[in-house]
Design a protein with these regions (language model features):
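Glycine-rich phosphate/diphosphate-binding loops and the adjacent beta-loop-alpha structural elements
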Residues: 63-69, 73, 101-106, 110
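C-terminal binding/interaction regions
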Residues: 2-4, 87-128, 132
Length: 134
């Protein structure tokens, strides 16, 4: 995974263009993301929250909240999905992992916030073009 950060989106886009040029790749050659799983769990039980929070050190899942579990391949696209979900709704990122074949994220919030975040993430992933994954 390679990330570029700047206050200027134009600088980030230019950096991406330069990296692709140096690697002799084109954006159109990227693998199109494929959703593997999208699940919404409402009214999380306190015991479920305790199990999920066992190894958390940051945001934690609060009992009674709604949780979104989203998985996508290739794994790196999960970061894009999380960013779009955060822009789409006021949610908490409980867990995100972009390693392996599938990227996974767990988000929490109110039911309406999670539905907005889900829609934002799924729509953004489905809007990306690319070649069919291998």
């Amino acid at each position: 995974m390679f990330e570029v950060h700047s206050r200027s989106q134009a600088e980030v886009l230019e950096a991406g263009r330069i990296v692709l040029d140096r690697l002799e790749l084109r954006q159109q050659e990227r693998i199109k993301p494929a959703l593997a799983s999208v699940q919404v769990i409402t009214n999380v039980d306190p015991y479920q929250a305790q199990l999920i929070n066992r190894f958390r050190r940051g945001s934690m899942l609060v009992p009674g909240r709604t949780m979104l579990v989203l998985e996508v391949a290739p794994a790196a696209y999960i970061n894009f999905a999380a960013n779009e979900a955060e822009k789409g709704a006021s949610i908490e990122i409980v867990h995100i992992s972009g390693l392996g074949r599938f990227g996974r994220m767990w988000l929490s919030g109110t039911e309406s916030e999670i539905m907005q975040a889900r829609d934002a993430a799924v729509n953004a992933l489905e809007a990306l073009d690319g070649v069919t994954g291998r």
